A protein has these predicted regions:
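Secondary-structure boundary/capping micro-motif
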Residues: 1-178, 183-197, 207-254
Length: 254
């Protein structure tokens, strides 16, 4: 019928003309990693290692923006770090993780981010660069594993937790991530990780982290500016971000 055979056209089919054309599924592109970094390899890790894994992803603003947020989320305590990146590229990802390692130290980086589970995005293609330490030559700072293609639910905790970031940097408001700076990222990270969660028995992710690993909590506060805020000072809104920017003499994001 689509080709016009039989002397009829789609216009003569009363119901078909009311339906939108079906979307074509994107073809799955080949993964950039071998079986040693596959999701099946991740599942073969001991249960304790999988439970404390770090899920890595990116949060983007407008399609035309260059900057984005690289997010690292600890499954164990739900702390999620939003790290500003100048571009969504594999080189920028490695460079940003290098900065984190230098800021908090190799041992703290390992406790926070080993192993890492991420997706098959182009920004995560340099698995070797992500894994190698930049402070101790020849050492490995983490192990990297990737979800199956188009199966982002395999790192669903990270995906769901992005909702908390979107409370402060919502979609559809004309926010350009190119206008963000490091202080904005720290402010968002401190607020999001200071919010009490029912799933953590009323504790915040940072409070849970401090109870489990106070040295790592101190390293994040000292090296990245991510620190727990008093409950009464929390502002999980875009207005709070704009208020903080106004205090620094900057224009609002939207």
């Amino acid at each position: 019928m689509d080709e016009g055979y039989g002397g009829m056209s789609n216009a003569e089919l009363r119901r078909k003309v009311c339906h939108e054309p079906r979307r074509k599924h994107r073809e799955r592109r080949a993964t950039h990693h071998g079986p040693e970094r596959s999701y099946q390899a991740f599942l073969s890790l001991p249960e304790g290692e999988r439970a404390r894994a770090c899920e890595m992803d990116t949060v983007c603003g407008r399609p035309t923006d260059s900057q984005c947020l690289l997010t690292l989320m600890s499954r164990a305590c739900r702390v999620q770090l939003p790290l500003l990146m100048p571009t969504k590229t594999k080189a920028a990802t490695v460079a940003r993780l290098d900065e984190v390692e230098r800021a908090i130290g190799l041992d703290a980086f390992r406790r926070l981010s080993d192993p890492i589970l991420t997706d098959n995005g182009c920004e995560f293609e340099d698995a070797g660069g992500i894994e190698r330490s930049c402070t101790v030559p020849g050492e490995r700072r983490c192990r990297v594993f990737c979800c199956d293609p188009m199966q982002s639910q395999q790192k669903g905790a990270c995906e769901r937790n992005h909702v908390e970031i979107r409370k402060m940097l919502p979609k559809g408001r004309g926010i350009s991530f190119d206008d963000l700076d490091e202080v904005d990222a720290w402010f968002v990270g401190s607020n999001v990780n200071s919010e009490p969660r029912p799933s953590l028995m009323g504790l915040s992710p940072l409070a849970m982290l401090r109870a489990a690993d106070p040295e790592l909590a101190d390293a994040l506060a000292r090296g990245l500016g991510i620190c727990e805020l008093p409950y009464d000072d929390l502002g999980l809104t875009l207005a709070a971000v704009n208020g903080e920017r106004a205090g620094r003499g900057l224009a609002p994001l939207a």
